[in-house]
């Protein structure tokens, strides 16, 4: 271990450096023998101001042994092979200049130590390899310091007494080139590491202590410079470099005889502008770190204003906040100019403006200069973009049509206004000018549309009527991918016909159930789907039967049944023949393109005539097979089950000829047969799968509704996990009640189903508005009534508000169509709410606010809701038969009309003579018909003209006052304000009657002859 001992100022006063460990040195006491330098010290001599290097002890070292010269204090080089007095003089440390100092190595240039004393204490020697490697690194640092001091002395640099940090040697430099030439260990350099690891006793060396005590500096010591040998030495600073492995130093010749060999010529670095502040190792690292944290970021003022990194992020990275409570947001004081600015600066604003221009151009479909991706000059201003948007809006404005197609149902006001390129206000203003006061959304009938379009010079043509048969077009469900995977499926059979012809009774016999007995009024008011096992050809095959209602109000239900069916069974009563709904059912089946099988029912009743029924069917194009046609007709008795098996066999034969197939391995597609709202299960619907398989957990979209399969139920109410083709199932868990007749299909994800449902729901907005029965429809008849309302008494327009609650979605459609048939010239119907489910308190509140009545069709009312309605004085009427509902609505509409007063003629009399009395002239009359009553009104006619209208003041018979005189009797009567009687005048007595106003405006009205 090397120990450097300096002066009291802590600096080395001699230009020397310790030699490499193991350098040979001649000792006079031993003649020409050589010993290795084991310890070198730099001690203070007796003379003041003199410092020397001394070789304290010598021993032979097997590591990097070489011959090194000593350099005297005055610069004289003395070889180690000199006499012993040289050695002794070096030890004595006198002022005679005979002391020896070690020659510096050539490369590293380090600062001289401070004038203060640097004490390096000895360290304990250890035997492990890591400790020795650290010793070598410490020795290398010390040797580099000494080498720099020697180099600065030779080059004449000035020294200010400061000590620099050790400089790391080049890691790529080869240690062989710098190894001493005469080293005794050069022959064993390859095995040097292994020799060192073996722990040779000679290799025990003292370790240099790296931690140097922190000296205290003052300003005078920093600025103080010292001279040695007539030359001023100035300290030089270099950037700190990472430490490198120690390398052996190359021997150097004495300076005087061979000055070029002392060290390699070095170029002094340029002087540093700022004064060097000396700190210890720890202080230097702290200074560097703090400088890096607080160093400013240099930005070119001509560069982009947008920072590469967000200033807030950069500030957080450069100066992370201390742990603790963070400042509350919004308390930073920003410059008032920057408050409204964006975080990204001006360029960010320009980019956003460009995006706005591009977006405007894409939305408005106009060409805006500068809206391209590349910036080319100044963009459009805000005013220019606004002008472009206005121009695009004008271009997209509706254009008045020249020819308008109108159906029988009329048009909405907003739809008509769009077609005429005008506003709804102008249309409504025209209606106001004609005496109509529209309330809310109005539907204008076809005649009124023609009148309005005539004002705008628009031609109106009649559109083709949309028939219910259009709903029964059979949908093609199969795809091209299914053709190779088709399998047989059960047939779907729909039972259709007129009401009370025995459709449900036939199905009850087939299902062995009693459905007809449980139906209200004995009529079907909804579609029932059932799966039945039918024996055929020695085996049992599944069939699906659909029971449709036969009432005229349920035509759409029959159409839906025909659209999904494979075979239509038309039931005709043998004692009743073909009726209106029979013809409609046949038309639906023909429109759907399905085969028809006729079941002539009730052949066991008296008066049954199957031959007459077959004759009637042949007259409408259905020729029986027995008569050479192609329509199977089977006489049956559904009540007793006669010939029902023959009917089923005929149906299965027809189904076999059709070769009904489907692909059960794909996702399901089908049709909604019926839908409703259950108070315990929520929205529910009956699906019939037409292709694929519907499984529990599938995601289904059905027009404006979607469903993630929670549960599937068969026709018996049992849970099932899968529904194969042609199988009807009931599903629960829908987001809302779907529309009966819609097509459903399975989609991949719930998000896709929700998106499609919302899009389709928006497209049905107008249909939902126009679905209200009698939603203020304006017709020419109502217009005429409104115009004449000021002249004719007894007529006025009223409105009946109804809240309808039903059990099934299809029932809403049926009830609405049935009520639309009622005349609405004087009283209009307005359905405020049409929904499925039971009556609730919300319905009662709506009825209170709108003065409406609540009608339930196959719906129930909880007891609490009924009590709540009674307290609110709201009437709730529940029905199970549609006939009763229609009759009550008619009576309610008539009750809104004002009673009409009419004059009814009750008799006739002829004036036979005229008498004078004290009260005036009195007419003697003969009652020819009817009777004459006292205080009744009369009309006096003379030669066919009415000359007076008044009231009988007095009535006498043979001088007795009476109240009435019957026909064939004579009487005398007098009037209070009339006495100009003549013989032959005809008197017509009449009485005033009050009756309920008619729903339909009468063709004529009687003029009131008198008023009380």
UniProtKB/Swiss-Prot annotation:
Subcellular location: Plastid, Chloroplast
Pfam name, any one: EF-G_D2
Keywords associated with the record: Chloroplast, GTP-binding, Initiation factor, Nucleotide-binding, Plastid, Protein biosynthesis, Transit peptide
Domain tr-type G: 488-661
Chain positions covered by the region annotation G3: 547-550
GO MF annotations, alphabetized: GTP binding; GTPase activity; translation initiation factor activity
Region of interest called G1, as start-end residue ranges on this chain: 497-504
Region feature (G2): 522-526
Residues holding GTP: 497-504, 547-551, 601-604
Record's compositionally biased regions (Basic and acidic residues): 208-231, 277-294
The family this protein is said to belong to: Belongs to the TRAFAC class translation factor GTPase superfamily. Classic translation factor GTPase family. IF-2 subfamily.
NCBIfam families xref list: IF-2, small_GTP
The protein's name: Translation initiation factor IF-2, chloroplastic
Gene, per the UniProt record: IF2CP
